[in-house]
Amino acid sequence: MYRYLGEALLLSRAGPAALGSASADSAALLGWARGQPAAAPQPGLVPPARRHYSEAAADREDDPNFFKMVEGFFDRGASIVEDKLVEDLKTRETEEQKRNRVRSILRIIKPCNHVLSLSFPIRRDDGSWEVIEGYRAQHSQHRTPCKGGIRYSTDVSVDEVKALASLMTYKCAVVDVPFGGAKAGVKINPKNYTDNELEKITRRFTMELAKKGFIGPGVDVPAPDMSTGEREMSWIADTYASTIGHYDINAHACVTGKPISQGGIHGRISATGRGVFHGIENFINEASYMSILGMTPGFGDKTFVVQGFGNVGLHSMRYLHRFGAKCITVGESDGSIWNPDGIDPKELEDFKLQHGTILGFPKAKIYEGSILEVDCDILIPAASEKQLTKSNAPRVKAKIIAEGANGPTTPEADKIFLERNIMVIPDLYLNAGGVTVSYFEWLNNLNHVSYGRLTFKYERDSNYHLLMSVQESLERKFGKHGGTIPIVPTAEFQDRISGASEKDIVHSGLAYTMERSARQIMRTAMKYNLGLDLRTAAYVNAIEKVFRVYNEAGVTFT
């Protein structure tokens, strides 16, 4: 454990844990296949027991510690995949040595590597001084740089940033983005500060991170999160580039989610919400899953509810609305609105921008009940963690829960949803659109050229030459007396004839990433007979990928 005895406190890995064999719970895991209980194990086969890869509490409480909650989900996935990891080790070790090696690496993966806790003073506009608290957690450096957002909230704590950093590690692994996980938080309510004060806080926080080596294009790359956006990321990039990164040509790659003029990328603002849409799309169009839920594939006749009308909630609502689904309820911290005939996202966005709240929207009524218990097809919790608990899970009426937020479902609620045959599309897959497009922006900053710029004209000329070649061939074969046979491109081809723009590339790359990851989760769920337990399937995929990196790289310098 390392400790800075000043304004900053740096905590390294948790205390040493035995790396030998892990204990096992007596309860076996319940398998599901197409919504039905799994068949009894064959003679001689023992169902995988729940194993714990640290001293963290299992998912026994309705309101668990957030970081331990994530660790409990990790345990579920690790207990499923451990035997396969042992089987896949191609070494001369004995079976016992292989198993000890696997369990040791799983114990290495699980803790949060570093947590930086710091405080610093700022002078407010009225002349008074205030001490600001902030944190940055780095869960894993199996891939570098680390990646994770910065949030401004009075609820920020060490536990929260550790949990969110660990989720980022698994999230990046699920969608094959080569980053380790990190997360930062500043313990303030941004509504209580002027723009000038927020700029001071953001720039000073950046300098504190830089002094401790917690920010840099190849070290740790923050991004927007709750109550932060392009403006704050621009301040961070400018602060780093003007100081520590003054001589670094890649300095602006120290943060993503920037404005376009500061090295940002088209499509980043809507990326998380668009990713939520694509994630739902991949499962709602899968007939086998819809038959389990008693639903028809597609968005056409579906209703949905959004909890949280921020960046993620707004853009998720936009895309689902565009593809035919109907939003009947939207909720925020100050209240909810309801209209069984549907709520238009653009009209609601305009109203909120003008009035600062969704309450009073003329085309919807105030909803007094719990938004999480509204009768709908799809529920999108896009607010904060631990919203769906043991107490309200039995009353949830949605058939699909799409986790736009991080950690909205507690382990006990997750069990209830499995028992009730409700599909939960997990956070570590569904809201990975943001980090996916952040990866594209980071690469763009390192390449110092926007996507498509080098190929626009070549692709356009090539397409026109292709059309001319087809036209000339047809005229030689079928033309009479030198008559012409004009080739007219369709509207869709005309839109693409000049090649892909940066926005096109970002959108297609995100859609492909979400589709590929969804297929991997489906295959894993089928392979391990998990049925609707998509969360465990996603964790299994993440653990396999992170384990492979540690095992092949070696753990001497971990």
UniProtKB/Swiss-Prot annotation:
Positions where N6-succinyllysine occurs in the chain: 68, 84, 110, 162, 183, 191, 200, 346, 352, 363, 365, 390, 415, 457, 477, 480, 503, 527, 545
Location of N6-acetyllysine modifications: 84, 90, 110, 162, 171, 183, 187, 191, 211, 326, 346, 352, 363, 365, 386, 390, 399, 415, 457, 477, 480, 503, 527, 545
Gene Ontology molecular functions: ATP binding; glutamate dehydrogenase (NAD+) activity; glutamate dehydrogenase (NADP+) activity; glutamate dehydrogenase [NAD(P)+] activity; GTP binding; identical protein binding
Control of this protein's activity: Subject to allosteric regulation. Activated by ADP. Inhibited by GTP and ATP. ADP can occupy the NADH binding site and activate the enzyme. Inhibited by SIRT4. Inhibited by HADH.
Residues where N6-malonyllysine is found: 457, 503, 527
Residues the record lists as Phosphothreonine modifications: 410
Keyword Phosphoprotein found: yes
Enzyme category, top tier: oxidoreductase
Residues binding ADP, per UniProt: 450, 516
UniProt keyword Heme, yes or no: no
Pfam families: ELFV_dehydrog, ELFV_dehydrog_N
Modified-residue entries (N6-(2-hydroxyisobutyryl)lysine), positions: 147
GO cellular component, as recorded: endoplasmic reticulum; mitochondrial inner membrane; mitochondrion
Record keywords: Acetylation, ADP-ribosylation, ATP-binding, Endoplasmic reticulum, GTP-binding, Hydroxylation, Mitochondrion, NADP, Nucleotide-binding, Oxidoreductase, Phosphoprotein, Transit peptide
Modified residues (ADP-ribosylcysteine): 172
Protein modification: ADP-ribosylated by SIRT4, leading to inactivate glutamate dehydrogenase activity. Stoichiometry shows that ADP-ribosylation occurs in one subunit per catalytically active homohexamer.
UniProt similarity note: Belongs to the Glu/Leu/Phe/Val dehydrogenases family.
Subunit structure, as described in the record: Homohexamer. Interacts with HADH; this interaction inhibits the activation of GLUD1.
Reported function: Mitochondrial glutamate dehydrogenase that converts L-glutamate into alpha-ketoglutarate. Plays a key role in glutamine anaplerosis by producing alpha-ketoglutarate, an important intermediate in the tricarboxylic acid cycle. Plays a role in insulin homeostasis. May be involved in learning and memory reactions by increasing the turnover of the excitatory neurotransmitter glutamate.
Designated name of the protein: Glutamate dehydrogenase 1, mitochondrial
The organism of origin for this protein: Bos taurus (Bovine)
Gene: GLUD1
